[in-house]
């Protein structure tokens, strides 16, 4: 997909407690890290009698040392820190949302489309974006929803 193919919309996101594993890793290690992190989060929340309240997600912020990654699940309640799993939250408020369907290698184009939409519509990013994975890596054309928290640009 190119940027022209993406349909970006502004949505209101409800704040949601999450359980996550965080690390700074080389970008090429992200797929393996995500698999391990999701498995660990599911084990910890099950042991705490919590359930996933949504699809797995990832938040990625480039740093000098690699990519800062936060991977986990929205939860039915707050998680107590255990092993590498920590409580966090998906921020509430306005966000730009765009669906990418296809290889994860192409998801940057969806991020670029959301960034351009913000600029074209009087909004700016209010925090790092996150990706919600609707399908697993075994699906030929996986669906990834990108959310970019945003705020109106002040004149």
Predicted segment positions?
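A solvent-exposed interaction/effector surface
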Residues: 1-155
């Amino acid at each position: 997909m190119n940027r022209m193919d993406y349909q970006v919309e502004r949505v209101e996101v409800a704040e949601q407690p999450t359980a996550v594993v965080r690390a700074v890793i080389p970008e090429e290690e992200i797929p393996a890290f995500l698999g391990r992190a999701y498995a660990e989060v599911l084990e910890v929340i099950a042991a705490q009698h919590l359930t996933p309240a949504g699809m797995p997600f990832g938040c990625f912020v480039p740093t000098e040392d690699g990519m800062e990654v936060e991977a986990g699940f929205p939860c039915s309640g707050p998680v107590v820190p255990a092993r590498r799993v920590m409580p966090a939250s998906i921020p509430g408020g306005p966000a730009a949302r765009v669906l990418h369907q296809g290889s994860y290698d192409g998801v940057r184009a969806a991020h670029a489309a959301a960034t351009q939409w913000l600029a074209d519509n009087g909004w700016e990013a209010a925090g790092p974006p996150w990706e919600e994975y609707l399908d697993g890596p075994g699906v030929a054309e996986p669906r990834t929803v990108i959310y970019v928290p945003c705020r109106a640009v002040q004149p």
